Amino acid sequence: MTEELTTVRDACARTLENTARTLHLGASGTEFVAAFRAMTDHWGAARPHDLPLSDVSPDGSPVEYAVDLGGLAPALQFAMEPLTAGVPARDPLAARAIMPLLAGRYGADATRWSALADRLLPDDAHGPHVSMYGAEVRAGAPIRFKAWFYLNVTGPDGAFNLLYSALERMGTTHLWPVVQAHVHRAGEDVPFLLSLDLSDDPAARVKVYFRHFAADVEEVAAVLKAYPGFEPGEVRAFCKVMMGGRRRFSDQPAVTCVSLLDAQTFDRTAATLYVPLWTYAEHDGEVRQRVHRTLAAWPEALYRYDSVLAGIAHRGLDAGTGIHNYISWQPGRTRPRMKVYLSPEMHDVTPPPLGVSQQHHLSGQTTARGRTE
């Protein structure tokens, strides 16, 4: 648990500064941290317990850091939830205010966001959260911004219909078959996030994230088998290593995402697997050992991971879980692409399955159904 001697904004900005320095991002890292400060200015002098519990990290912290573990040019990413002290996280006002800031100051493209905002950022949201925003940077490259919308804002059974409505508003209903094909188990393979790259680049992505409730590793591998490069044996092996030999995602569902446009062109890898790390290990030291096993063949990736982890962790790794959120996996031409997602852990160690902000809302089996049936 972080000592509440500084504000959430300052504490997380310092961690980003240190991580950017570790990754040798130079001036790009400085601009990146400045963007984080601008996007979190509305937090003001709030300390961790002044803000409502967030869904960004499982312990309720409103920030998550992510580092690409492959490639010569490392990428650093953050995600944040627009929150206001004393106001429920589902309130959309703070979320609506971020997009004009990004468009006006950084030239982010608001076209798709504007088509969706009144539908996906409602005043009477059913779920506990409505949106997240994030940014990613590499040395010498411009900052790329993105937004995530929660798909349960009209209720847990409305996710598919809301997603179809979102595609309709963007003029992309021709992509609906991609969503349908990704659902292998009706009522258990459930879309819960829609993300947009906030760019007018033709390659800007529209991604849908799915939770796969009570799936075993074979069922997850079967979902991903449809996408080039996802060999079922490799997916199963990766999951088993990161889950300590377990075969079923019994406590915390696996997550996959599909980039809808890429799924039709195959120019880029269309899918990503995310394995949750805080529920299938005794402590973060055990998670670190599993990451080491996965990265053993790539010493430069292992060094990058250890260096970043050392700068973010502020307690002994054997004290519990909660520093590691997820690890993602995609096939690559010469090696898999992996990214590790880490928490500032501003609240308690060892968060529960689904995270502290979702444990009651999602405590039962999700049974979202709709147009896929």
UniProtKB/Swiss-Prot annotation:
What keywords is this UniProt entry annotated with?
Transferase
In this chain, dimethylallyl diphosphate is annotated as bound at Q77, K146, W148, R205, K207, Y274, R337, K339, Y341
Instruction: Name all FtsK domain ranges.
Output: 346-373
Catalytic residues, chain numbering: E64 (nucleophile (probable))
GO-annotated biological processes: alkaloid metabolic process
Gene null: resulting phenotype: Eliminates cyclomarin and cyclomarazine production and significantly reduces the levels of desprenylcyclomarin C. Accepts exogenous analogs of N-(1,1-dimethylallyl)-tryptophan including N-(1-propargyl)-tryptophan to produce the corresponding cyclomarin and cyclomarazine derivatives.
Q: What is its EC number?
A: 2.5.1.-
GO MF terms listed in the record are: metal ion binding; transferase activity, transferring alkyl or aryl (other than methyl) groups
Q: Does the keyword Transferase apply?
A: yes
- Entry's InterPro entries? Aro_prenylTrfase (IPR033964), Aro_prenylTrfase_DMATS (IPR017795)
| Residues binding L-tryptophan, per UniProt | D55, V56, E64, R211, Y326
Q: State the top-level EC class.
A: transferase
- Role of this protein: Dimethylallyltryptophan synthase; part of the gene cluster that mediates the biosynthesis of cyclic heptapeptides, known as cyclomarins and also of cyclic dipeptides, called cyclomarazines, which have both antimicrobial and cytotoxic effects. Catalyzes the reverse N-prenylation of monomeric L-tryptophan with dimethylallyl diphosphate (DMAPP) to form N-(1,1-dimethylallyl)-tryptophan (r-N-DMAT).
Q: What is this protein called?
A: Dimethylallyltryptophan synthase CymD
